[in-house]
Amino acid sequence: MDFSYEVENYMYNIKNKPDIFGEQRILDENDNICGYEEKLLINATMLDLESAVKLARKYNAFVCPAHIDKQSNGIIGILGTFPEQPEFDYAEISDIAKTEQLKQNYMNLANCSFICNSDAHYLWDIHEADNYILLHDEPYSSDIIRKELFKKLMQKE
């Protein structure tokens, strides 16, 4: 929670308008609504990219820029290039077929591994399991899944 509190210092204090942006529900571990976030969360923070990564790594976070190959909200679409700094071990893309082209176009991605994700916000938008990571999950718990995922991601191929 320390990370969340620290990031909050860099957020713009703009109140959410649920009628426009939707409710920002706070759920418990059983998906029961236990509150609503009043501050609008879709805004950017006051952190630049390098500062955000530095802050995340201070808390031992795994940093992976999302949907870098998408024009809207992807880092390449926003910046016009993939930045040389900070360095990332992984980047998430929506189409695994773009891997070699991205590495050719952006030399600083040459040593980067890619995670392919549908970026689905609804169950019916999830693609077939063409790209997947097998994880040990017994006895089932979200903590085990999270630990297994990070362990697998840290084993660069």
Regions of interest found by a model, annotated:
Residues 102-109:
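Short, aromatic/basic amphipathic alpha-helical patches
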Residues 137-157:
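Mid-to-C-terminal alpha-helical segments outside catalytic/metal-binding sites
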Residues 1-89, 97, 107, 145:
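Extended substrate/RNA-proximal surfaces in nucleic-acid metabolism proteins
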